[in-house]
Amino acid sequence: MIPGELHIADGIIELNVNREKVIVMVINNGDRPIQVGSHFHFYEVNNALFFNRNFALGFRLNVPSGTSIRFEPGQTREVELVRYSGELKIVGFCKKIMGKLSK
């Protein structure tokens, strides 16, 4: 094996199988593009993004790790969110939630 070399299994690798997911419609009401990363707590994204935040509590974008979605000014798009797993401790981000979520 070469340092840094990756051995990836053959076939399709499915992400977030059997995890709770929701789809939300998001509108960028701002005058600048907004980019949201794969593991950012979607409930706490920029306030210029308009959507029903109640559906996003405890969820993140359902995209591969390290990627993001960009919302252009005035753009409306549908995104799929996936529930965080583990202990559900949400800390940091924009400090709107600083603790453990109930399941």
From Swiss-Prot:
Catalysed conversion reaction: urea + 2 H2O + H(+) = hydrogencarbonate + 2 NH4(+)
Superkingdom, natural source: Bacteria
Keywords, comma-separated and alphabetical: Cytoplasm, Hydrolase
Gene3D superfamilies noted in UniProt: Urease, beta subunit
Compartment list: Cytoplasm
EC id: 3.5.1.5
Gene Ontology CC annotations of this record: urease complex
CDD domains on file: Urease_beta
Main subcellular localisation: cytoplasm
Family of the protein in this entry: Belongs to the urease beta subunit family.
Subunit structure: Heterotrimer of UreA (gamma), UreB (beta) and UreC (alpha) subunits. Three heterotrimers associate to form the active enzyme.
Protein name: Urease subunit beta
Organism in which the protein naturally occurs: Blochmanniella floridana
